[in-house]
Amino acid sequence: MPQMDPELFDRGQFQAELALKSSPIAAFKKAIRHAREVLDARFKGGRDIRRLVEDRAWFVDQILQEAWKRFAWSEDADIALLAVGGYGRGELHPYSDIDLLILLDSSDHEIFREPIEGFLTLLWDIGLEVGQSVRSVDECAEEARADLTVITNLMESRTIAGPEHLRQRMQQVTSSEQMWPSKHFYLAKREERKARHAKYNDTEYNLEPNVKGSPGGLRDIQTVLWVARRQFGTLNLQALVGQGFLLESEYALLSSSQEFLWKVRYALHMLAGRAEDRLLFDYQARIAALFGYQDGDGKRSIEHFMQKYYRVVMGISELSDLINQHFEEVILRAGESGPATPLNSRFQVRDGYIEVTHPNVFKRTPFAILEVFVLMAQNPEIKGVRADSIRLLRDSRHLIDDDFRKDIRNTSLFIELFKCKEGIHRNLRRMNRYGILGRYLPEFGHIVGQMQHDLFHIYTVDAHTLNLIKHLRKFRWPELAEKFPLASKLIDRLPKPELIYLAGLYHDIGKGRGGDHSELGAVDAEAFARRHQLPAWDSALIVWLVQHHLVMSTTAQRKDLSDPQVIHDFAQFVGDQTHLDYLYVLTVADINATNPSLWNSWRASLLRQLYTETKRALRRGLENPLDREEQIRQTQSAALDILVRGGTDPDDAEQLWSQLGDDYFLRHTANDVAWHTEAILQHPADSGPLVLIKETTQREFEGGTQIFIYAPDQHDFFAVTVAAMSQLNLNIHDARIITSTSQFTLDTYVVLDADGGSIGDNPARIKQIREGLIEALKNPDEYPTIIQRRVPRQLKHFAFAPQVTIHNDAQRPVTILELTAPDRPGLLARIGRIFLEYDLSLQNAKIATLGERVEDVFFVTDANNQPLSDPELCARLQETIVRRLSEPSAQPQSLQIDI
């Protein structure tokens, strides 16, 4: 720390200020304000961050010493003021904790009670927020023995004022000889680190990471230092080089990474004006600009900055793991190493960990760089790689060049990994962590740490890719067969499972370059297959899956699956059962690996429906498609059988059906038609709206809640219905609107509750929904359709202009209106009002929310039940929707993620 820095704090000038003022508080506050301005200016001017955090700690030392002097401590008083924790290390960010220990020789605090209280009150009055404790030396020993946090803080202490001998005594009584021997300390810190990582989902790749506590954050570096200090007495990272725990290159990487995170943390505190260690969306773009990042190479400035951040913390995690593995071997298993079990001439297993048989293995036989991961997959009982061998792997990465990538031994080993029955995900993750995967596949290296700046994709591209492969593996777990029944069955039937893993590895590899990532990825996948000499059929399937990995999800999401033509077109697209099976399994894994909130029961039901209907179409033969008339006849016949068995007069049913039109029977199953018909025939015409509620399926992990409404068609009926459902905390995923020739509306909605599940067997909730809808629909003109809700913080950072496309369906007499817009309260109700103004009839709607945006599809007709044919009308409609949804009140609403 600096000995003197008059620009930051001029003691003479400060004391002169004190002498002029009746109260010292103003002088202290002025000094603190001035120092903050100076330090912020130095930061913006590019001051070395290490100097900067030391400068701030030095300044706080001066302020505390001046404050301490204002109280009547006798010269021989056995009381001292100590800095502990991060402040004790001499590191302070703008709003870091200032942890103080007032250390006494005696446990009799009373004799110093009054000056201590006065000192702490002064600190509070001048705006210096401190964390303080008052203890005797013996009390320090007692509390440190019982509390890991206390002993950790006391290990890093400095005397600010008072006699130094008190601190030295405290250090003696809390040394590893007295308490917390290094083995126990390491075990406790290991568990603490594990719990901390779990708090942040065990990933470096959170959308809004904590630069201090997240995996790969500053706390991981500090944990290494704490353990090293307890074991070896080392005071800094560089000392670990002398102990043999770090190479010079590793020290340089850790040191530069720490400096980068310090800069980010300093900027966070400065921008937030408070202690803020979360890299929130609020600050990401501002820090990217502050650090000079710019748009380019197909990425926005914020994505460049966050990729740098993620790569830094991944590097810290890698080195932290390496050092902790060393600690395991030196501290926990010192002198207890067991015999080695040979695997081959290059590798052996010792104490459950694989290691090289000699230090030149990778230099002499470079293919061993990939072989080690195959061996671990083939021997799943191996826990991991020993620290020295990890270091050799890291140091051998330069051997992976173009010649290495073309070597048939290496290409064969890489493919062999994907044929292993276990450990594919685990070892790909290790390869990524050790920097091998991105080196062997440069196109994969490009996506390491690549974020997408939205709330839909909550992982970086590389983390999502490995997560997808993990989900493919999990489909084989018996305990998940109930949640993923179809995927679990199909994964074992795929003729070559390794192909779906390879397709998964490449499905998003084209992201971050600009252009269509599916097309770019398909080109890379084809080059990979050629380099690895895969058979033509295998290569073609992988490329097809990569190129079309979004098609099944998009079809299920945005197309009307009740339309036989949609099913026929999709069956023609996949071509055969094998392609359908592979694509379904890949799609389910992709959705689950994108965001845990995406996979809900309704999406599962849609994909199963598309899979099942397509399978039937393939069995029937693509040359024999099911036509509309045949499907209508089948539905009516089956529904009539159900009704007659239940005692319904078939003539009454057919008279009602004659008013409904063909689309009703295309969009509903026979069971639903019978359910609706029986209820309508029994419902008195003058008794208000009929509202029916039931589950779409009895499968536990599939389906949603179906709400059927039968009532006279009225002004603003759709807008009121969806507004009422919003007030009832229901999320609409599907809407089917039928108007009978007798001017009754038959509306069917599929909804999920606010938690993403169906309503289920909950009589009280069902009663609440039914009564709420009936009450709203009795007087729709009086019901407010504009919902006012607070905008969640995260959504405020993803505003964009709504986009509307309008085109006519080539197969059916309807117009398709596709909307992409920021999520917002009452959006469907506003759309319904616009349709009313333009005298449009809504036939069907597919509702989807992807993070911060909606992607909805509406199927509409004009007043004569015909598709829109006037280009000027379509242009006005498009302009109206964009303008209304762009109004200041049209802000994003609460987050409901669905694909």
Swiss-Prot record:
Catalytic activity, reaction form: [protein-PII]-L-tyrosine + UTP = [protein-PII]-uridylyl-L-tyrosine + diphosphate; [protein-PII]-uridylyl-L-tyrosine + H2O = [protein-PII]-L-tyrosine + UMP + H(+)
Activity regulation info: Uridylyltransferase (UTase) activity is inhibited by glutamine, while glutamine activates uridylyl-removing (UR) activity.
Entry GO MF terms: [protein-PII] uridylyltransferase activity; phosphoric diester hydrolase activity
Keywords, ordered alphabetically: Hydrolase, Magnesium, Multifunctional enzyme, Nucleotidyltransferase, Repeat, Transferase
InterPro entries the record matches: ACT-like_dom_sf (IPR045865), ACT_dom (IPR002912), HD/PDEase_dom (IPR003607), HD_domain (IPR006674), NT_sf (IPR043519), PII_UdlTrfase/GS_AdlTrfase (IPR013546), Polymerase_NTP_transf_dom (IPR002934), UTase/UR (IPR010043)
Cofactor: Mg(2+)
CDD domains: ACT_ACR-UUR-like_2, ACT_UUR-like_1, HDc, NT_GlnE_GlnD_like
Pfam families: ACT, GlnD_UR_UTase, HD, NTP_transf_2
Region: Uridylyl-removing, residue numbers: 343-705
Membrane-spanning intervals of the chain: none
Domain ACT: 706-784, 816-897
EC number(s) reported in the record: 2.7.7.59, 3.1.4.-
Database matches in NCBIfam families: PRK00275.1, UTase_glnD
UniProt domain comment: Has four distinct domains: an N-terminal nucleotidyltransferase (NT) domain responsible for UTase activity, a central HD domain that encodes UR activity, and two C-terminal ACT domains that seem to have a role in glutamine sensing.
HAMAP family: PII_uridylyl_transf
Family: Belongs to the GlnD family.
Function: Modifies, by uridylylation and deuridylylation, the PII regulatory proteins (GlnB and homologs), in response to the nitrogen status of the cell that GlnD senses through the glutamine level. Under low glutamine levels, catalyzes the conversion of the PII proteins and UTP to PII-UMP and PPi, while under higher glutamine levels, GlnD hydrolyzes PII-UMP to PII and UMP (deuridylylation). Thus, controls uridylylation state and activity of the PII proteins, and plays an important role in the regulation of nitrogen assimilation and metabolism.
UniProt name for this protein: Bifunctional uridylyltransferase/uridylyl-removing enzyme
This protein's encoding gene: glnD
